[in-house]
Every structure is written in structure tokens, then in C-alpha cells.
């Protein structure tokens, strides 16, 4: 089934983030001697963060991970005696509040993947930076609760009640901020931010189709951004959201300094000629592999957006399927050297014409991609603003097929409020009363059009080259079968 395959890939893509969860401390949270917190001991209220294993109400940091009493006791028992748990299914059982006792094997594996260990350090002995990240997460959850209480007391994706089993995903090892403990940085080897630690299985090969319009067609309608909700999203929640997304962006992209170093290098004429002389089939495959690498990091970024992992599984998949290509264009804008009209492609600067083929539709696709990426680059956004813009684009609530419209709208409102605050602080209006935000929002229809062009060109290419095998993730994201699963 497509859904299972997709989340298998996500699990492998984010394994390195999960491995860093053991930065949290063991046992109950206690403030170091002499340390006082004016907000009422944030550490003592760490239970506001749901259990990382099953999503139930947590009771503190146990064996290095924020968990509930049930998962704490389960892990203790699993370590105190010789156990030989067996999974009666396929070792991919859902581990949530309702189902956590159904498979001890999968529950233990999830504990271990999150970093639970008998040797984990206590919270008070964590580094100052690690403690601050935990405190930031607590502040974020508290700010979300305040915004929820003021704006929509009836329901919210930030409800502190334990989500129902239907809302808990089997990849719930990432709650809305779980990536915040990661000190991981994506490797410098690729200007696309592709880490060398990604396994070969993640770049398996795959298939494609044309029925993409149904799930990406954009019809301009006025998105209602609840002014009352935004007015209550105070500086606390804005500041933490901005910090969170900026860190997620930094950890899933190559450093901007490294990109600019490549801009300053002399053009590699031999490499440019090599790409210009590639045949249509070779160029498609090479571009698909580069795009797949970028999308793997986009998936990591999405999972670190506060609240994203609490959306339904179907909505998460749909948002990523219809939004990943759009976010790739946004990310391309920071790799574009406007003075050369060239993009950092792997480890070489390539001009726009290097991607042209003899097919007129493909040339149009390349031109539209460069044109849109250039329009973003010309705005000279900061890295933080790019992070917020990616969140805004991904969470655009008017995508066909989404079910949790209210939840997605609330997440979108938070991102909208944060990016508006950031842009108004850093940018003057462009012309008259036209703001940078206006320009960014006007790009949304362009993203939809380019996504459709991509699928049309890809469909035509597959008809002409039926034996070409694309990377697995690329095939899953842009195949007709997987699109039909979501409609």
C-alpha cells in the first residue's frame, strides 16, 4: 500500500534525527540547585509535552526521553530481565496510546530508536544548550495553549488532551517539536543539503504518471485568516515558532556560506559542457536524483514544523505530495546566482540553458522554474524568512483533498502571523503599498502551475522512455497510483 511505503521511506530519512533524542535526561525533572525560573519552573511543567513513544500525557524525562509513566515502566521492565519479544505482524505496528500494549516488540524498538537508555544522563546534567531546547519546547506548548484558549477553545491541533488513536500516527516518535533536541547538521557534501549518512535504499528507483492535476490544481480563492486568532498569537509563540523553523531549515540545508563560496568560483567549463551534452534520458534521471535528495530533506523539515506530525496521516502525505515540488523551488532560490543566472547543481554552477532539451514543453518547464526561483531570490529573504515561507507554502490550506481543514488552517495562521512579523521588521514595501509578503503569496499559483507542468512533462517522457527507472521516492511522489490513493 502506498501509505505504508511512503512512511517507511520517511522513517529511514529521519533516522539520524531520532538517534539524537537521547540528549534528554533520565528520571524526573529537577531544577539544578539555585536555579529559579520566573515563569514558574518550566522544567517542572515538562509534562505538557506528550510522551514521545505513545503520545499519552508525559510525566517527565525517563531514560533520556520524555515519556509517560506507562512507557517508562515498560522500558524499565524490558531492561531488567532477558526478554525475547516477537512481532506477530511485519514489525511495523502502530504504537500509540490505544495500541501500545498490543506489540511489545515494536514498542521496545520505538523506545530504542528514540534514544531511551539506562545510561542516559539526568536532566540537570545536560548541557545548557540542551536544557534550553527543552525549555523552548515547553514554552512553545504553553504559548500554543494560550492561543488556543483565546481563539478557539472548542478544538485545536494543540489540544493538551491526549490525541485519539485515529490522530496518533505510527511515526509518532516525532511530536510537534521532537526534532528540537537534534544537534544534527546535514552534511556539507551536497549543496542540496543531502547528508552522506542517508542509506542507499532511500534512492531506490521508480515509476510515474500523469493524473496530477486533480490533487494540485489551484483555484484562487480567498483564504480566510482569522484576525482574532492572529491577534492572540502573541510574541511568545511567534518567537519560538520562528526559532524552531529557522533551526529546522538550517539543519536540512547546506550552510549559505558554502553556497556563496561556490558562487565565487570560476565556472567549470568542462562540467558545464558535460551537462549540456547529456541526452534527454540521462538529464531527466540526473535531475530526478538531485530532486529526490532535496525532497528527502524537505520531508525532514516538514516533520519539524510544530503541529505537522499531529495532522492525520493522510493529510501529511497529501501536503507533502502536492507541496514538496513547490518547496524545492523555494529552496532552489537560495542556490541561484542572479548575476550568472546559474544554479548550484550538486557541486557545479550550471546556467539555465544547461537544462534545456529539444522538447518545447520541457524547455517551458525549466524556464518557469528558473523564473519563479529568481523572483524569490530577488527579494533577498533571510534564511529565517525562507524557513517561514516554506512552512506557509506547505501548509497552504486550500489543497484539494485535505480532510483536517481546520487544523491545517490554524497551523497556516501561525506561520502567516510569524512571517508577517518577520517581513515587516526586515523589509520596506516594494512599491507603493505592495509588500514582500504580497509578492510571496502571489507566487502560490505559479507553484501550482509549475507542478502541473512537471507532471505533464514527466508523463510525456515516460511514454517515450517506458524503461527508465526513477528513484523510488520520486516515483512515489509523482506516480498516478499514489495520486489516486489520495483522491
From Swiss-Prot:
Keywords: DNA-binding, Metal-binding, Nucleus, Receptor, Transcription, Transcription regulation, Zinc, Zinc-finger. Residues 237-480 form the NR LBD domain. SMART domains: HOLI (SM00430), ZnF_C4 (SM00399). It holds the Pfam family Hormone_recep. The keyword Nucleus applies. InterPro entries: NHR-like_dom_sf (IPR035500), NR_DBD_ROR (IPR044101), Nucl_hrmn_rcpt_lig-bd (IPR000536), Nuclear_hrmn_rcpt (IPR001723), ThyrH_rcpt (IPR001728), Znf_hrmn_rcpt (IPR001628), Znf_NHR/GATA (IPR013088). It comes from the Eukaryota. GO terms for molecular function: nuclear receptor activity; RNA polymerase II cis-regulatory region sequence-specific DNA binding; RNA polymerase II transcription regulatory region sequence-specific DNA binding; zinc ion binding. A zinc finger (NR C4-type) spans 51-71, 87-111. Residues 145-176 are annotated as: Disordered. Its main location: nucleus. It is found in: Nucleus. Induction: The expression of this protein is developmentally regulated showing peaks at midembryogenesis. HR3 transcription is ecdysone-induced. Residues 48-123 bind DNA. GO terms for cellular component: nucleus. Disulfide bonds: none annotated. Residues 157-167 have a biased composition (Polar residues). One of its GO terms (biological process) is regulation of transcription by RNA polymerase II. Putative receptor whose ligand is not yet known. PANTHER family: NUCLEAR HORMONE RECEPTOR HR3-RELATED. Belongs to the nuclear hormone receptor family. NR1 subfamily. This is Probable nuclear hormone receptor HR3. It comes from Drosophila melanogaster (Fruit fly). The lineage of its organism: Eukaryota, Metazoa, Ecdysozoa, Arthropoda, Hexapoda.
Amino acid at each position: 500500500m502506498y501509505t505504508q511505503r511512503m512512511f517507511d521511506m520517511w522513517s529511514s530519512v529521519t533516522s539520524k534525527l531520532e538517534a539524537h533524542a537521547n540528549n534528554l535526561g533520565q528520571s524526573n525533572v529537577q531544577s539544578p540547585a539555585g536555579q529559579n525560573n520566573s515563569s514558574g519552573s518550566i522544567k517542572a511543567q515538562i509534562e505538557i509535552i506528550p510522551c514521545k513513544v505513545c503520545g499519552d500525557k508525559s510525566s517527565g524525562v525517563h531514560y533520556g526521553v520524555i515519556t509517560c509513566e506507562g512507557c517508562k515502566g515498560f522500558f524499565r521492565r524490558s531492561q531488567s530481565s532477558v526478554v525475547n519479544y516477537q512481532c506477530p505482524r511485519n514489525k511495523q505496528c502502530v504504537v500509540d496510546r490505544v495500541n501500545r500494549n498490543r506489540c511489545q516488540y515494536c514498542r521496545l524498538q520505538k523506545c530504542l530508536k528514540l534514544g531511551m537508555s539506562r545510561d542516559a544522563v539526568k536532566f540537570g546534567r545536560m548541557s545548557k544548550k540542551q536544557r534550553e531546547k527543552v525549555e523552548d519546547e515547553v514554552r512553545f506548548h504553553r504559548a500554543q495553549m494560550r492561543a488556543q484558549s483565546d481563539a478557539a477553545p472548542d478544538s485545536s491541533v494543540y489540544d493538551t488532551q491526549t490525541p485519539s488513536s485515529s490522530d496518533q500516527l505510527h511515526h509518532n516518535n516525532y511530536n510537534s517539536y521532537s526534532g528540537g533536541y537534534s544537534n544534527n547538521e546535514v552534511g556539507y557534501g551536497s549543496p542540496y543539503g543531502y547528508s552522506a549518512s542517508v542509506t542507499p535504499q532511500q534512492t531506490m528507483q521508480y515509476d510515474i504518471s500523469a493524473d496530477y492535476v486533480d490533487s494540485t490544481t489551484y483555484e484562487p480563492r480567498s483564504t480566510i485568516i482569522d484576525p482574532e486568532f492572529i491577534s492572540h498569537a502573541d510574541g511568545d509563540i511567534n518567537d519560538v515558532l520562528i526559532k524552531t523553523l529557522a533551526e529546522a531549515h538550517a539543519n536540512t540545508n547546506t550552510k549559505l556560506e558554502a553556497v556563496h563560496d561556490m558562487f565565487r568560483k570560476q565556472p567549470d567549463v568542462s562540467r558545464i559542457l558535460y551537462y549540456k551534452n547529456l541526452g534527454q534520458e540521462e538529464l531527466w534521471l540526473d535531475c530526478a536524483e538531485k530532486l529526490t535528495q532535496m525532497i528527502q530533506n524537505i520531508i525532514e523539515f516538514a516533520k519539524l514544523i510544530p503541529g505537522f506530525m499531529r495532522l492525520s496521516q493522510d493529510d501529511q502525505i497529501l501536503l507533502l505530495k502536492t507541496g514538496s515540488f513547490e518547496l524545492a523551488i523555494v529552496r532552489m532560490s537560495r542556490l541561484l546566482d542572479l548575476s550568472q543566472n546559474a544554479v548550484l547543481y550538486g557541486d557545479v554552477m550550471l546556467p539555465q540553458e544547461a537544462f534545456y532539451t529539444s522538447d518545447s514543453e520541457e524547455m517551458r518547464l525549466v524556464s518557469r522554474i528558473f523564473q519563479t526561483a529568481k523572483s524569490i531570490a530577488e527579494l533577498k529573504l533571510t534564511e529565517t524568512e525562507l524557513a517561514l515561507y516554506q512552512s506557509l507554502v506547505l501548509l497552504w490550506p486550500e489543497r484539494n483533498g485535505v480532510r483536517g481543514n481546520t487544523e491545517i488552517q490554524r497551523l497556516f495562521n501561525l506561520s502567516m502571523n510569524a512571517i508577517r512579523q518577520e517581513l515587516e521588521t526586515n523589509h520596506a514595501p516594494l512599491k507603493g503599498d505592495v509588500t514582500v509578503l504580497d509578492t510571496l503569496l502571489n507566487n502560490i499559483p505559479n507553484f501550482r502551475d509549475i507542478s502541473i507542468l512537471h507532471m505533464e512533462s514527466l508523463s510525456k517522457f515516460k511514454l517515450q522512455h517506458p524503461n527508465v527507472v526513477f528513484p523510488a521516492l520520486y516515483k512515489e511522489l509523482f506516480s498516478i497510483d499514489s495520486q489516486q490513493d489520495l483522491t
